[in-house]
């Protein structure tokens, strides 16, 4: 009844699907899918991890940059949020997905690994006057906690039900059977012990929450911080964590242990940065 993994799925053709999951879990996901494959050979499955690369283009000028490096149409009307298309970047074939993990307008560019240097150079050359800069996984983590985006292995886990992790809108027990439904229904009858919240951590001058830190209320452990970082767009230290459902209220005061020091923390609304998703669903008028 928990969350085993998370996938982005692109339908490439009538009977061909391209699946993307967390790189660190590729072996686990590969074996799990194989275990559910029909035994009659009607479905073929291939692990492309070692032959594919991914570059992420994100930010308010992402569309302008993509139009410079491709002849395909990246307008909002033609390339809507949460859609995917096969495009060309330079002379490289690319599966472009209008999704990203940072809460800004952007695309994931999935490509044969042998084209990666070509695509990277093409992007960097075309984006010089736009202020384009490379960024790494720690910067991405900072951006994702500002949006309350959930990470497999921390906020999403077999340890927590999808209801506890805030995935209610994706779970429909009455629409037909799915893997884990029976276990999830039993879990619902028993009741849930946790609820995912976003917190502002106060007075963190030299350290932010990294994860697996106890959360306290009146001296008692009432939850666990699953992840965190300093949010530079918000100018605040942000943490995600599981707490007892009765404490999961906006404005609730708690404490988090960071490196042996107690820090005051306040529960915020989910997705404290760009709550309206304006940047994610940006139209051309948002580009500047």
Where are the model-predicted features located?
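Short beta-strand-to-loop capping motifs
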Residues: 21-23, 58, 111-113, 201, ...
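Glycine-centered loop/turn motifs
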Residues: 26, 77-85, 208-212, 251
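Conserved small/polar residues in nucleotide/adenosyl-binding loops
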Residues: 278-287
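Short, conserved charged micro-motifs
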Residues: 27-28, 63-64, 115-121, 208-209, ...
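Extended, compositionally biased flexible segments
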Residues: 1-16, 21-39
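Glycine-rich, acidic
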Residues: 35-188, 192
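Short beta-strand/strand-turn micro-motif
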Residues: 1-6, 93-97, 104-106, 110, ...
